[in-house]
Regions:
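ATP-dependent adenylation/nucleotidyltransferase module used to activate substrates
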Residues: 1-163, 174, 184-185, 190, ...
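AMP-forming adenylation/ATP pyrophosphatase catalytic core
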Residues: 130-137, 142-384
Length: 384
């Protein structure tokens, strides 16, 4: 049997993952990461209140500890607030200010869960780090390399946010829930008497209070302007963090139609909040960070037949030199689309779609699937 560290969150998924491993006879250690959360904010009445978010609330910590007691496993709470802020929160803010739409889960999985926490697990002589993600991992029958595959429950599949993992990380990764459906997981939790069996799951960004990213950007930017390093971003070496600034809104012909509040408050395809008068609905077609400008136009103009991807990561570790066919997912919940992928220099790729798609958004992950059943994650990167 193996020694396995389980990343616990106080939710039903990580709780059942720990229980399954314990039932299989493994030595299980529960670790919960204390992540960064916003400090109190001053409301209109002058009273400072904590803006609630999902990062390690007292309730979540209590739930995780209660499950650990039920399973009779050690439980530790590890503070990684600064690392999370530096690697995930600052990145999230900077990307929005630069006119891109980030997915912070990609960065968190790469730098926090499967680097920082995995290293902690290995320091405890653990063989594996397990999480409650819905995804499968196995060995390729011919090459022996680790494969990342979609979960049995396609509705809950989380392979998209784990495409960033490399072979070394996958060698120590364990995903007990990959073969189960969400309803089966809840049923097991209830059978084991877990109070989290009916706990609602969050679809929100964990560190953004009330799922209001625009409000978060306002508060975070204000903290930066005031020089509050504990609640605002810290510039990394060689990097410059700026604040959202108003700028022009152009149509496709270059005519100025109005002013925007700051690039951080908009995303590709957005229609609401433009404050423009037009006989037809207008959508954000382009976010031009160099000119600090938005370009808007009709919905039909959102369609693209090709795009480029940067920071390409190949799960096998082998970088192809020839074009290859794959199914690409351009957003977390998007439907995969057939595409031709042409590798380029500098960890980039050109993607040509068989069917044009709308609102392909810079900053989002593009994840490519293939293999015998089309459920293997081949590679992924960030849309440029």
């Amino acid at each position: 049997m193996a020694r396995i560290v389980v990343a616990m969150s106080g939710g039903v998924d990580s709780s059942v993952a720990a229980a399954l491993l314990k039932e299989q006879g493994h030595e299980v250690i529960g670790i919960m990461l204390r992540l960064w959360s916003e400090p109190g904010v001053i409301e209109d009445d002058g009273i400072e209140r904590v803006v609630q978010n999902k990062c390690c609330s007292l309730e979540a910590v209590d739930d995780a500890r209660r499950v650990a007691r039920l399973l009779d496993i050690p439980f530790y709470l590890v503070n990684v607030e600064q690392e999370f802020k530096d690697n995930v929160v600052d990145f999230f803010y900077q990307e929005y200010v630069a006119g891109r739409t980030p997915n912070p889960c990609l960065v968190c999985n790469r730098h926090i869960r499967f680097t920082l926490l995995l290293n902690r697990a290995l320091a405890l002589d653990a063989d594996y780090l397990a999480t409650g993600h819905y995804v499968r991992v196995d060995d390729h029958p011919i090459t022996g390399k680790r494969r990342l595959r979609r979960a049995v429950d396609r509705e809950k599949d989380q392979s998209y946010v784990l495409h960033v993992l490399n072979q070394q990380q996958l060698a120590h990764a364990c995903f007990p829930l990959g073969q189960y459906t969400k309803s089966e997981v809840r049923a097991m939790a209830a059978e084991w008497g877990m109070t989290v069996a009916t706990k609602a799951e969050s679809q929100e960004i964990c560190f953004v209070a009330q799922n209001d990213y625009r409000g978060f950007i306002n508060r975070y930017g204000a903290a930066l302007a005031e020089g509050n390093s504990s609640s605002g971003p810290t510039a990394e070496a060689g990097g410059v963090i700026t604040l959202p600034k108003p700028g022009p809104i152009y149509n496709q012909d270059g005519k100025v139609l109005g002013r925007h509040r700051g690039l951080a408050y908009y995303t590709i395809g957005q229609r609401k909040g433009l404050d423009l008068t037009s006989p037809e609905p207008l959508h954000v077609l382009k976010i031009d960070a160099q000119q600090n400008a938005l370009v808007v136009g009709p919905a039909l103009a959102l369609e693209q037949a090709s795009f480029t991807v940067g920071k390409m990561h190949y799960v096998s570790g082998e970088i192809p030199t020839e074009p290859f066919e794959a199914a690409v997912r351009v957003r977390y919940k998007a439907i995969e689309q057939p595409a031709l992928v042409t590798p380029l220099e500098g960890k980039r790729a050109q993607v040509t779609l068989l069917h044009p798609q709308r609102a392909i958004t810079p900053g989002q992950g593009a994840v490519f699937y293939g293999g015998d059943n089309g459920d293997e994650v081949l590679c992924g990167g960030l849309i440029e």
